[in-house]
Amino acid sequence: MNILTQIKINKLKEIKKLKKTVSLDVLKKRVLTSVRDVRPFEAALEKKGVMNLIAEINPKSPTAGKLIKTPLDQIANLYQRSNADAISVLTDQRFFGGDVKNLNRVKLIAKQPILRKDFILDEYQVYESYLKGADAILLIVSLLNGKKLM
């Protein structure tokens, strides 16, 4: 079994467990009643005549192991000062050492829009991403069927 298949199987188990803790309906209601700072991701990447930069926080890789030793807060501060246009935060825990809680941690430090980089397979994760502070999410089309994309 390839790594992408392993990740997908694990992620589906995680989502099932999350749904038992907080239902999708409850999550949707929380989104509707929440008030939060949403930063314009697309607008941040529309500079003309220069390269746009999305800086990434990726703690580890399933093939390379641990990638960073610097604390998350220090990395977020560095990206804030570097004038990156947006910050991508890997949130998959098992394979990439991330945590969905890191979205809000980075958002409290940096002014840039925050992209949640994970294996988004279910609408549940979209609502969760919003509530945890993401301004955008990354979708891997090869993991989703046409119905899921609509």
What residue spans do the PLM features occupy?
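Conserved N-terminal beta1-alpha1 strand-loop-helix module at the mouth
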Residues: 1-114, 121
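Conserved anion-binding
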Residues: 109-150
